[in-house]
Amino acid sequence: MNKDIATPIRTKEILKKYGFSFKKSLGQNFLIDTNILDRIVDHAEVTDETGVIEIGPGIGALTEQLAKRAKKVTAFEIDQRLLPILNDTLSPYDNVTIIHQDVLKADVGKVIEENFADCKEVMVVANLPYYVTTPIIMKLLEENLPLKGIVVMLQKEVADRMAAIPSSKEYNSLSIAVQYYTEAKTVMVVPKTVFVPQPNVDSAVIKLTVRETPAVSVENDEFFFQLIRASFGQRRKTLMNNLMNNLPDGKQHKAIIEEALQTADIDGKRRGESLSIEEFARLSNVLQKALF
């Protein structure tokens, strides 16, 4: 039986064997604690009927734990230097496929279709590189992929934002974007000491359960997100000020914006971070009708 990859000794051995040096630009921090990996897989509720997409497998620490429980694992790895290492470390598992590609440029829908046709459900489970966390998650959500959910390790601060509630310090446009598509919950905080090299920040694992239909009904989701970004433009400004300053031709549409706020029963003196997703949806539908 092979020793688990995610132990300090085995990780050190593997890195030494291949003369691997970390690339800061790729946000490479490898986990060296199998208990934490097991808990991540538990939170993802992976079974022998699950197809798993992993992003940034590193030397295969999480991949290995997923492969033990999932029907199939397909992992995207951008760093060519890791391919021979993964080939070696994951050789005992015949249910793993490695794709050498940047996931942001990949047709993930096609990969799901081709690799997971015989799986009952598809999950994304990953220890994400911190510098591209948000673009990766938003890509997965916006592409309306047939996912049951996403369980990922990321910077704690970003996890806090994704799961934040209105009027909290962390609540922003990312909170609403993520909660529009999913139910978000931070399930674990992970200290920096369980990584090599140690990151500068603490991490957290967030579980995003994909909703069957979005949290709110909006006429035009592109305008809905534009309105949200505008509302959070300058945090200390009122909603009315932010909308005038940040929506295209906002100042010219002052009267229309004022009337829309009134119709939606929202006080323009409030700040964007005090509005719930339902209030944003109401305002978006009224304002979109008035402007277009």
Curated annotation (Swiss-Prot):
Recorded superkingdom = Bacteria
Q: Subcellular location, in the record's words?
A: Cytoplasm
Main subcellular localisation: cytoplasm
Task: Write the signal peptide boundaries.
Answer: none
Per its UniProt record, what Gene3D superfamilies does this chain match? Ribosomal RNA adenine dimethylase-like, domain 2, Vaccinia Virus protein VP39
**Which InterPro entries does the record associate with it?**
KsgA/Erm, rRNA_Ade_diMease-like_C, rRNA_Ade_Mease_Trfase_CS, rRNA_Ade_methylase_Trfase_N, rRNA_adenine_dimethylase, SAM-dependent_MTases_sf
| A GO CC term attached to the entry | cytosol
User: SUPFAM superfamilies under this entry?
Assistant: S-adenosyl-L-methionine-dependent methyltransferases (SSF53335)
Give the catalysed reaction(s), semicolon-separated: adenosine(1518)/adenosine(1519) in 16S rRNA + 4 S-adenosyl-L-methionine = N(6)-dimethyladenosine(1518)/N(6)-dimethyladenosine(1519) in 16S rRNA + 4 S-adenosyl-L-homocysteine + 4 H(+)
Enzyme Commission (EC) number: 2.1.1.182
Instruction: Recall the GO molecular function terms of this protein's record.
Output: 16S rRNA (adenine(1518)-N(6)/adenine(1519)-N(6))-dimethyltransferase activity; RNA binding
Q: Which UniProt keywords apply?
A: Cytoplasm, Methyltransferase, RNA-binding, rRNA processing, S-adenosyl-L-methionine, Transferase
Task: Quote the Pfam families the UniProt record gives.
Answer: RrnaAD
Function, as annotated, reads: Specifically dimethylates two adjacent adenosines (A1518 and A1519) in the loop of a conserved hairpin near the 3'-end of 16S rRNA in the 30S particle. May play a critical role in biogenesis of 30S subunits.
Hey, which family's this protein in? Belongs to the class I-like SAM-binding methyltransferase superfamily. rRNA adenine N(6)-methyltransferase family. RsmA subfamily.
User: Entry's PANTHER family?
Assistant: DIMETHYLADENOSINE TRANSFERASE, DIMETHYLADENOSINE TRANSFERASE-RELATED
Q: What is this protein called?
A: Ribosomal RNA small subunit methyltransferase A
Q: Which organism is it from?
A: Bacillus pumilus (strain SAFR-032)
Q: What is the lineage of its organism?
A: Bacteria, Bacillati, Bacillota, Bacilli, Bacillales
This protein's encoding gene: rsmA
